[in-house]
């Protein structure tokens, strides 16, 4: 700690928001680096949390009229050299989450941001910044500060032409061309090509670096045209606070939710189960297979716990006992729910996470799911769960049955291994070591 204190850095974290999913990940990064002894400001478009280190961006009027005049002249020259068209609504296939409409636009005033932040950053870390800033804004920040810039892959957007999920498209590997499956109107498809080329150009000029948020996005970043030449790509694997999410109360967790010790509880869920990326139809198929194959005395022990804001209507046809639980935001209660469950299932077919996988493992709950996202390197067959090929309901059912039929000692080993995997590759302590390496460069 003394070494870090002697070489204290100014760190800027950029994110559209500070709560939920990808925004929560940026908040965790801010906390980890702040606890390492550095000066940290998290600048967001929408502020929800009360912490003082989180500051909301707003455009400030420059005190000097002369400075305003200079900026107007500079912008006028820029627009003459390279005109920037205003962002427009384009027609897209929603499953790709093509949200970056214009990488050439400038969305923030750098002097305003630096004045709000209160220092010139040495390092900048960005997560999800949709509807806030883009790679051109990041280049402008670099030009003004010469800070080292790291983009964190909460999804694929940092190295695509605009989509957050590729669904098999290899544009991020080759460079987005005139054909883009995410954009539905022919004359608008050029948007992806223009975005990608601007992103690539900006990354080269400012030497952007990437940090992976999961095993899958690590592989994708390593193959991407924009970041394939980066020598080392670190992977922070979700970032789990093991002081909150752990297995210390596993022996009493079922009592908290009035669950029976004689039943086997399968936990699954998402904020929106209707999202096709989450692949819940494959879980339904796997459960139907188990319904046919398991003898009645075993089937009666299985209870499905579903956590979601909205439950897919098709879950009504599941014959196993089931119980809906409202989406939980309190991490202490969520930790107890994970500990109360005997198995967590993730059926995402196109996902960079989800964080729920690492959260469940941290609480000593084995995981079964498709080999994508965070499962790629956090779930190990016959160790802490099972991985099935994406969209393979048969293999998914087999993985569920294997965990269900583990004897007590083998299950205990799976549970301990789940915790160990998070402590070694997904904990705050693990992430701190990674950020220490980065900040000491």
Regions found by a protein language model. Give the residues of each.
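Conserved acidic donor-binding segment of nucleotide-sugar-dependent glycosyltransferases
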Residues: 381-382, 386-393, 402-408
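Nucleotide-activated donor-binding/catalytic signature segment of Leloir-type glycosyltransferases, i.e.
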Residues: 298-301, 306-335
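A short, active-site helix/loop in glycosyltransferases that binds the activated sugar's phosphate group
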Residues: 160-164, 187-232, 240-250
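Aromatic "clamp/platform" in nucleotide-sugar-dependent glycosyltransferases that forms part
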Residues: 349
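Short hydrophobic beta-strand element within catalytic cores of glycosyltransferases
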Residues: 366-369, 379
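Short alpha-helical donor nucleotide-sugar binding micro-motif in glycosyltransferases
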Residues: 336-341
């Amino acid at each position: 700690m003394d070494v870090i204190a002697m070489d204290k850095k100014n760190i800027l974290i950029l994110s559209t928001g500070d709560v939920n999913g990808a925004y929560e990940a940026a908040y965790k990064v801010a906390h980890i680096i702040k606890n390492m002894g550095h000066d940290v400001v998290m600048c967001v478009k929408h502020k929800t949390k009360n912490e003082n280190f989180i500051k909301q961006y707003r455009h400030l009027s420059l005190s000097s009229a002369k400075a305003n005049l200079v900026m107007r002249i500079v912008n006028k020259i820029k627009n003459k050299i390279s005109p920037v068209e205003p962002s427009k609504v384009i027609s897209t296939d929603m499953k790709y989450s093509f949200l970056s409409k214009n990488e050439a636009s400038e969305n923030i005033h750098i002097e305003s941001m630096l004045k709000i932040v209160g220092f010139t950053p040495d390092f900048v870390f960005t997560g999800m910044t949709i509807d806030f800033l883009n790679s051109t804004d990041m280049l402008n920040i670099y030009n003004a500060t010469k800070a080292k810039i790291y983009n964190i892959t909460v999804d694929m957007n940092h190295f695509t032409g605009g989509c957050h999920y590729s669904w098999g498209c290899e544009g991020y590997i080759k460079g987005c061309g005139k054909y883009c499956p995410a954009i539905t109107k022919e004359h608008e498809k050029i948007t992806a090509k223009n975005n990608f080329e601007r992103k690539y150009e900006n990354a080269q000029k400012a030497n952007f670096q990437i940090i992976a948020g999961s095993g899958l996005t690590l592989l994708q970043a390593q193959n991407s045209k924009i970041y394939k030449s980066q020598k080392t790509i670190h992977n922070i694997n979700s970032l789990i606070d093991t002081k909150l999410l752990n297995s210390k109360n596993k022996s009493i967790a079922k009592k908290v939710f009035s669950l029976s010790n004689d039943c086997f509880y399968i936990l699954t869920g998402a904020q929106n189960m209707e999202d096709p990326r989450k692949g819940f139809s494959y879980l339904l198929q796997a459960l139907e297979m188990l319904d046919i194959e398991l003898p009645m005395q075993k089937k009666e022990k299985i209870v499905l716990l579903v956590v979601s804001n909205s439950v897919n209507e098709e879950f009504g046809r599941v014959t196993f006992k089931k119980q809906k639980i409202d989406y939980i935001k309190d991490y202490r209660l969520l930790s107890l729910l994970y500990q109360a469950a005997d198995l967590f299932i993730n059926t995402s077919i196109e996902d960079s996470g989800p964080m729920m996988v690492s959260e469940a493992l941290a609480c000593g709950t084995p995981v079964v799911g498709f080999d994508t996202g965070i499962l790629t390197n956090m779930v190990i067959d016959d160790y802490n769960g099972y991985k099935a090929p994406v969209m393979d309901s048969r293999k998914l059912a087999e993985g569920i049955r294997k965990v269900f039929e583990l004897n007590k000692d083998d299950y205990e080993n799976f549970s301990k291994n789940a915790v160990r995997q998070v402590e070694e590759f997904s904990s705050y302590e693990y992430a701190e070591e990674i950020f220490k390496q980065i900040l000491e460069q």
